[in-house]
A protein has these predicted regions:
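Bacterial N-terminal signal peptides
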Residues: 6-14
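Conserved catalytic region of serine esterases and O-acyltransferases that act on ester linkages
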Residues: 21-67, 71-80, 85-86, 138-243, ...
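Alpha-helical scaffolding within the catalytic cores
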Residues: 87-100, 296-308, 340-345, 366, ...
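Stable alpha-helical elements in mature extracytoplasmic
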Residues: 93, 117, 121, 125, ...
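Conserved SGNH/GDSL esterase-like catalytic core that processes O-acyl groups on lipids
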Residues: 107, 117-340, 348
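Short hydrophobic beta-strand that contains or immediately precedes a catalytic carboxylate
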Residues: 108-112
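Serine-dependent acyl-ester chemistry module
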Residues: 217-219, 278-293, 322-337, 360-398, ...
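Catalytic His-Asp segment of secreted/periplasmic serine-dependent ester chemistry enzymes
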Residues: 301-302, 363-480
Length: 480
């Protein structure tokens, strides 16, 4: 009997140790560097010209359908002002933000596709919250630098051509252990380089600590690190396998960092920027063009959650659906299964955070110019389903509402905020246009409009101006 008891205790000890290992923060290596003054502008190396042959001009280009082919327009309820001068709330949710808890920052994170990667939606949310620019900190940056369609809150990024992107949503083995943004950048080519000017603009200060996030493997990796144009410092990354951090420490703000791969294979997983000043509001935006929610399904959750052990979020948002709806044929049952499992994994990583699922906007269909020409001559409408993607996006929005309710989250639909199915055609006709010419994406003005709609539908209110710099935020709505 005693042997059985000892065996049980021993097994419990092993399980406890395993749990501690799983929940341990990433391994940390520190490198003291010397920040410099009077450094030169960061200039990226010119890319080699594309070898693709020039494409012939399309004799029958795609364009907007003629106006009389479009569905009946539906408008959202008119916005009115309250006695306080704030936009009237259309949603029934309680206000999500209230000043409280001095000394504790409010942290928000949002994962998404190209709609988030552009950065305009999140920037407008910060503006609507009335948070001063110097009180907002984007401290976690995903490994998406250099990717077309990505805007980051740093001045410049330079990526040499040897780096390969490993987005998690593709489900490949090399991306199952991702960085915080559910993606990696990989190179095993000597002299591959990454460089950043981490300042927000030329007049802004840098950061006293710059953390390079990476995956430590069993093989050592040799790097050379340069700060603010100074001499390279050799670094050998070697340690326990798993998520790891190389922290650059300086006595004054760091503005520029250059990383060169000397030998080995590096899986870069993001940047963390830190300064000694407390920031009352932190919003981390993890957007990647082409992404789907499947990145949350395929990720090794035990690996992923270690990035956030010391970074609890009060609010987590997932903005996906546009790329899922582009699949042909679209399988709603398969989408529901993927979404359900992905949201379950997200809730495993952030069990106490308020969560919001954001469904895609309306999407239109372009037609060949010849179709519009023939229609004008024949006087009858062509047999083209202009509501094909609008209908799919409506199904995705409905599914997200159902899955959100099951998971204890909130759901919000860009398409509903636009006025429903078919509104992409009319958003494209706004002045300035709110819809991009592809009828899939939005213009900067369109993203800002969506952010304003989201802000009002959530029942959020701006922070009081006099105390915005000192006031910290919390979620006033119950944890769902």
């Amino acid at each position: 009997m005693r042997n059985v008891i000892w065996l049980v205790l021993a097994m419990a000890g092993v399980q406890c140790a395993a749990a501690q290992e799983i929940t341990a923060a990433p391994a940390l290596m520190q490198l003291h560097v010397q920040a410099q003054a009077g450094f030169k502008e960061l200039v990226c190396d010119p890319r080699a010209p594309s070898r693709r042959p020039p494409t012939a001009q399309n004799p029958d280009p795609m364009e907007m359908p003629d106006p009389d082919m479009l569905p009946v327009r539906v408008k959202r309820p008119a916005q009115t002002d309250t006695a306080e001068g704030l936009p009237a709330r259309r949603g029934t949710l309680p206000p999500s933000f209230r000043p409280n808890f001095p000394g504790q920052p409010y942290r928000m994170a949002i994962w998404g596709d190209s709609h988030l990667a552009a950065g305009f939606f999140s920037e407008e949310l910060v503006k609507q919250l009335n948070v001063p620019g110097d009180a907002v900190s984007n401290v976690l940056l995903p490994a998406n630098m250099g990717r077309a369609g990505v805007r980051l809150p740093i001045r410049r990024s330079c990526v040499s051509p040897q780096w390969k992107y490993e987005p998690g949503y593709l489900g490949r083995d090399n991306a199952t252990a991702p960085g915080p943004g559910l993606m990696n950048m990989f190179s095993d080519q000597p002299d591959s380089t990454l460089a950043w000017d981490v300042r927000k603009d030329a007049k802004a200060a840098g950061y006293e600590r710059v953390r390079i996030l990476y995956q430590q493997t069993g093989a050592p990796v040799h790097l050379a690190i340069s700060v603010d144009g100074g001499a390279e410092q050799p670094v050998i990354l070697d340690g326990q396998e798993g998520p790891a951090v190389l922290e650059l420490l300086a006595g004054q703000p760091i503005s520029q960092v250059r990383l060169r791969l000397v030998a080995g294979a590096l899986r870069f997983q993001g940047l963390e920027l830190s300064s000694p000043q407390a920031h009352p509001f932190e919003i981390d935006v993890f957007g990647y063009p082409g992404a789907t929610v499947a990145g949350w399904k395929s990720a090794d959750i035990d690996y992923l959650r270690r990035w956030f052990i010391q970074r609890p979020y009060q609010l987590v948002m997932l903005e996906f659906g546009t790329n899922e709806g582009n699949a042909a044929p679209f399988n709603l049952a398969a989408y529901r299964n993927t979404l359900t499992e992905s949201v379950r994994n997200m809730r495993t990583v952030f069990p106490t955070a308020t969560c919001i699922l954001i469904a895609p906007g309306d999407r239109g269909v372009l037609v060949p110019r010849s179709v519009n020409t023939r229609r004008r001559k024949a006087g009858r409408l062509p047999d083209i389903d202009l509501m094909r993607f609008a209908t799919i996006h409506a199904e995705i929005g409905r599914t997200q509402r159902e899955v959100a309710e099951e998971a204890g989250c909130i759901a919000w639909s860009m398409q509903d905020a636009m006025g429903g199915r078919g509104q992409s055609y009319y958003w494209a006709q706004q002045t300035p246009a709110w819809m991009a010419k592809d009828l899939i994406h939005f213009t900067p003005a369109g993203y800002r409009q969506l952010a304003r709609e989201f802000f009002m539908d959530m029942g959020w209110v701006p922070l009081p101006t006099p105390t915005a710099r000192e006031t910290l935020l919390r979620v006033d709505a119950p944890i769902l």
